[in-house]
Amino acid sequence: MADRGGARRPRGDQEPLGPRLRAPRSARETRQSESRAERGLPPSQRSSVRSAASGHDRSTRGAASGACKPRVKKKVRPRSSQSEKVAHSKELTRSKKLTRSKKVTGTQEATQVEEVTTIEEATQTEEITVAEEVTQTENMAQTEEMVQTEEMEPPTLSVVVTHSNERYDLLVTPQQGNSEPIVQDLAQLVEEATGVPLPFQKLIFKGKSLKEMETPLSALGMQNGCRVMLIGEKSNPEEEAELKKLKDLEVSVEKTANHLEELNKELSDIQQGFLAKELQAEALCRLDRKIKATIEQFMKILEEIDTMVLPENFKDSRLKRKNLVKKVQVFLAECDTVEQYICQETERLQSTNLALPE
């Protein structure tokens, strides 16, 4: 230390320093030349060159001559390509892991969303199914109620009846025992609404007179709202009484006609040989007596009809009486035919020498 920098003075006796003296020019030029020469060398050899130039091998730091070692910036060693690749691969691995985790998270979230959606859809489907079943049940119940109502309520038909200048809106319902309304039901309803008795009525539908009382209205082509025209006058008490008499006589004619039909059948059995020959004579005598009583009954009916005096204004009564007389005359003619056959069979038995009871 004494050789390099001389003797050190004690700190307490330090004298004020004077201005720093520069080194001689020759020495400065030498350092500059050294530095210039040293610039072309690598950093590992620069210190030795500098020492050789100064004439001794020592460190320049702290030299008494005041020469300082120039500071050299420490260069950052560039990363090698292998380290960069490793870092890049690590970053790629990290980014891939993040991407995978994100994908897994997204997949899990999507799966959860799909499960929730599936549950909601299943719930909605169940609700819709339940609602449809309830609707079907209600519809079936309503249909059953409608069917029961239709079965309980008989079919009806609305008809518009016109009489002179009057109009009647009627609702025809079938009577007990009929599945649908017939002409008889319509005529009775017209009688109640208009006051025209059924015998005096003439109902016309589409230009045709409704005469058959047992014909269903649907068979005539009648539908709801159809129009029916009524021709006839309201009842006359006197004529109504005459009509009642004629009706009673008509019932008697029907009964007598039924009796005549039975006699005609018995005669047919005898003619076909269904009865034994020994019994035929007695049966023929009995038939002869019955046919004569039947003829007498028809004659009495004709007499009662003839005794009825009907004014000319009783057109319906007069027409009914005329038709009844014709009917009785037809039955009388049939009685004459039966009586004639009885006589022929009796003569045939007599010709075969069969004794007839007295």
Swiss-Prot record:
**Subcellular localization, per the record?**
Nucleus; Cytoplasm
Organism from which the protein derives:
Rattus norvegicus
- CC annotations in GO: cytoplasm; cytosol; membrane; nucleus; perinuclear region of cytoplasm
Q: Pinpoint the residue ranges of every sequence repeat in the record.
A: 102-111, 114-119, 120-125, 126-131, 132-137, 144-149, 150-155
The free-text tissue note of the record is: Expressed in the CA1 region of the hippocampus (at protein level). Expressed in the uterus (at protein level).
Q: What is this protein called?
A: BAG family molecular chaperone regulator 1
Name all Ubiquitin-like domain ranges: 157-237
Show the segment(s) annotated as Interaction with PPP1R15A: 229-358
| Compositionally biased residues, Basic and acidic residues | 1-14, 26-39, 85-94
List, alphabetically, the SMART domains matched. BAG, UBQ
GO terms for biological process, alphabetical: apoptotic process; chaperone cofactor-dependent protein refolding; negative regulation of apoptotic process; negative regulation of motor neuron apoptotic process; neuron differentiation; positive regulation of Schwann cell differentiation; positive regulation of smooth muscle cell apoptotic process; protein localization to mitochondrion
Q: Where is this region: 7 X 6 AA tandem repeat of E-E-X(4)?
A: 114-212
One GO MF term on file is: protein-folding chaperone binding
What the protein does comes down to: Co-chaperone for HSP70 and HSC70 chaperone proteins. Acts as a nucleotide-exchange factor (NEF) promoting the release of ADP from the HSP70 and HSC70 proteins thereby triggering client/substrate protein release. Nucleotide release is mediated via its binding to the nucleotide-binding domain (NBD) of HSPA8/HSC70 where as the substrate release is mediated via its binding to the substrate-binding domain (SBD) of HSPA8/HSC70. Inhibits the pro-apoptotic function of PPP1R15A, and has anti-apoptotic activity. Markedly increases the anti-cell death function of BCL2 induced by various stimuli.
Residue ranges of the region described as Disordered: 1-113
Xref: Pfam families: BAG, ubiquitin
SUPFAM superfamilies in UniProt: BAG domain, Ubiquitin-like
What does the subunit section of this Swiss-Prot or TrEMBL entry state?
Homodimer. Forms a heteromeric complex with HSP70/HSC70. Binds to the ATPase domain of HSP/HSC70 chaperones. Interacts with NR3C1. Interacts with the N-terminal region of MAPRE2. Interacts with PPP1R15A. Interacts with BCL2 in an ATP-dependent manner. Interacts with SIAH1, SIAH2, HSPA8 (via NBD), HSPA1A (via NBD) and HSPA1B (via NBD). Interacts with ESR1; the interaction is promoted in the absence of estradiol (17-beta-estradiol/E2).
Which residue ranges are recorded for the region named Interaction with HSPA8? 185-232
User: What UniProt keywords apply to this chain's record, in alphabetical order?
Assistant: Apoptosis, Chaperone, Cytoplasm, Nucleus, Repeat, Ubl conjugation
Post-translational modification here is noted as: Ubiquitinated; mediated by SIAH1 or SIAH2 and leading to its subsequent proteasomal degradation.
Boundaries of each BAG domain copy? 259-339
Q: Which domain of life is it from?
A: Eukaryota
The record's listing under InterPro entries reads:
BAG_chaperone_regulator, BAG_dom_sf, BAG_domain, Ubiquitin-like_dom, Ubiquitin-like_domsf
